[in-house]
From Swiss-Prot:
Any one Pfam family match given in the protein's UniProt record, by short name: BacA
Keyword flag Cell wall biogenesis/degradation: yes
Protein name, as recorded: Undecaprenyl-diphosphatase
Membrane association type: Multi-pass membrane protein
Transmembrane segments: 46-66, 95-115, 127-147, 154-174, 200-220, 227-247, 259-279
Highest taxon in the source lineage: Bacteria
Name of the coding gene: uppP
NCBIfam families hit by this protein: PRK00281.2-5, undec_PP_bacA
Cellular compartment(s): Cell inner membrane
Gene Ontology annotations for the cellular component aspect, listed alphabetically: plasma membrane
E.C. number: 3.6.1.27
Amino acid sequence: MIDTTAPLSLLEALVLGIVQGLTEFLPISSTAHLRVVPALLGWDDPGVSVTAAIQLGSVAAVIAYFRRDLTQVLTGISRAVRHGQWRDPDARLGVAMVIGTLPILVLGLGIKFFWHAGYASSPLRSVPSIAIVSIVMALFLAMAECMGPRLKQLGGVTGRDGFVVGLAQALAVIPGVSRSGSTLTASLFDGWNRADAARFSFLLGIPAISIAGLVELKSALSTSAGAGPLPLLVGIFSAAVVSWLAIDWLLRFLQRNSTWIFVGYRLVFGAGLLVWWAFKSAN
């Protein structure tokens, strides 16, 4: 059941879609911003179901952007199944994506079916929790930026790489962690170059975000306080357009630059939230 108290307006859906598109693939946590931006604007929390459904726009964008990569992965897996060519780079990438999806799939479905109501109202979704998590993850990203050797490339990905990065992806069920941030951090710690780390993060997110969005879409549409089809379509469409632009920008950016700008942003974001929350609580 969706955890909002009022239907979503078209303006709210548009803003949430833009926020989703900007933050899903940047290592700054879309879940945190989708929780915090409505709070700052005085809107109701859109809830787990609506935010997950709007993520389908990001799924459409990443599938469209990486359509050639995905076609090659499917072709590689097909060759491996038919001819046993499991050392093929495209087949290995497909296997890594499957293995990397399992941790968040198990954890996410467990939360959905056994702790959904508790998770939706959990202290993990509170502003101070999101702020603290954002600061902690910024520090981990900073350490990864300093320590990683930057030698691994996507063509050499293994099932072990998929599992390691997949475990990091599972941490994204905690608001403020950032799915792209946790996977990028784990990849950098594991020795990937920045651009390929981001590319694998995007590809790995396709199954996880797709499943989460489809599972929650019915709930977002079916409850009396839900968003309704038109606002959801507005949110999904705006998320798709902005996500495409964000993916393209980040891949180009990381070919020439480090992730320090995101470390700084997350530190300022987290500290600013704590100050805002303290001021609001005092009044």
